[in-house]
């Protein structure tokens, strides 16, 4: 595959007002993507656009709109809406393209652009490369004549539509009545829809992270800071806590005691329930190389399989589609349930866990520890440039660590696809050895 100039593992992402996350690049994305999808025939073409609550969304959104409208694509604006909702609405509104303006779990200073095809799935690498090629050539060609410019409208009921879709994934014979639920929306895209959906299903809802001001998204709250949710669960004596990230495509849960449950355990809860009901497809789960060894062992012990992919929910989804799986995800909390959605959806995943709680009559504390995690350490090392993983000393440190683990664990060292970080993960049955191995690799990376 050719080298990508703009797109990373999850669309285009960066600090607002710095390349590539500038108004100029956003305009080019609109022009290029609009030309690509409009060129297929002569009918009117439609793009739908959602965003999270970052201040820079007010800069990126109009730049994208200008690009799309100038090449003749009609635009529908959703305003703040979760990423999975934009994917769903792309398909339900029969749009040619869906756009989400978000940097997911990152700090407010970052932003990003994610693109979805008419089927609601993220664009392929090949499609992104075609857009990149168009971004760097003759953008003044193919502009629409004055009467052919795109029309732009806001969709006032986008949030209500998504709430109804989400509620439809919850069993009709069940209600959340009697359950006390803390929901942390990270001051992000789900700040209205998530509490409302839970309330309409009967829960007593304690919302937090629902006062976005443009700069507080993900700030000491949401799925990257579950301690805030856990504290409130204990304070309100809630049955469960649910923490979403800024664009609500991932979640973390905590039980009634405030113990945090990560994406691996959430996948295990849902997968085993599906298997018991005879609804698990392809005999297993798709996860990434970062998922805990304990999840793999649990699947094996239950006669199921765990298939691993590179990090990134797009790669998980690709393998799910290839193999016919209906559940996959990441330890970080992306949980994809393809019976309902084309991408990770934190709110839908939370509802499936709640359904298991109700079906079994067990508290979250009894469900949240489906397997004993193998001791695992993850360290992030920031770097300013170059390719640290190509240095001889780093390669030697990794090889030495693998030799020490001697088949009783795993090492994964990789660059982040969204930040200038090297992520170093090791796991195994001996916690002291795992710690030693990670420390050695971290030192090697920092030294280059």
Curated annotation (Swiss-Prot):
GO molecular function list: magnesium ion binding; phosphoglucosamine mutase activity; phosphomannomutase activity
GO cellular-component term (any): cytosol
Phosphoserine: modified positions: 104
Entry keyword set: Isomerase, Magnesium, Metal-binding, Phosphoprotein
Active site: 104
Positions of Mg(2+) binding: 104, 245, 247, 249
SUPFAM superfamilies from the UniProt entry: Phosphoglucomutase, C-terminal domain (SSF55957), Phosphoglucomutase, first 3 domains (SSF53738)
UniProt remark on cofactor binding: Binds 1 Mg(2+) ion per subunit.
Keyword Iron: no
Modification after translation, per record: Activated by phosphorylation.
Listed Pfam families: PGM_PMM_I (PF02878), PGM_PMM_II (PF02879), PGM_PMM_III (PF02880), PGM_PMM_IV (PF00408)
Transmembrane segments: none
Any GO BP annotation: carbohydrate metabolic process
Keyword Protein transport belongs to the record: no
Catalytic activity: alpha-D-glucosamine 1-phosphate = D-glucosamine 6-phosphate
Entry EC number(s): 5.4.2.10
InterPro entries documented for this protein: A-D-PHexomutase_a/b/a-I (IPR005844), A-D-PHexomutase_a/b/a-I/II/III (IPR016055), A-D-PHexomutase_a/b/a-II (IPR005845), A-D-PHexomutase_a/b/a-III (IPR005846), A-D-PHexomutase_C (IPR005843), A-D-PHexomutase_C_sf (IPR036900), Alpha-D-phosphohexomutase_SF (IPR005841), GlmM_bact (IPR006352)
Domain of life of the organism encoding this protein: Bacteria
Needed cofactors: Mg(2+)
Similarity field: Belongs to the phosphohexose mutase family.
PANTHER family in the record: PHOSPHOGLUCOMUTASE (ALPHA-D-GLUCOSE-1,6-BISPHOSPHATE-DEPENDENT) (PTHR42946:SF1), PHOSPHOHEXOSE MUTASE (PTHR42946)
Function: Catalyzes the conversion of glucosamine-6-phosphate to glucosamine-1-phosphate.
Name of the featured protein: Phosphoglucosamine mutase
Phylogenetic classification of the source organism: Bacteria, Pseudomonadati, Pseudomonadota, Alphaproteobacteria, Caulobacterales
Gene behind this protein: glmM
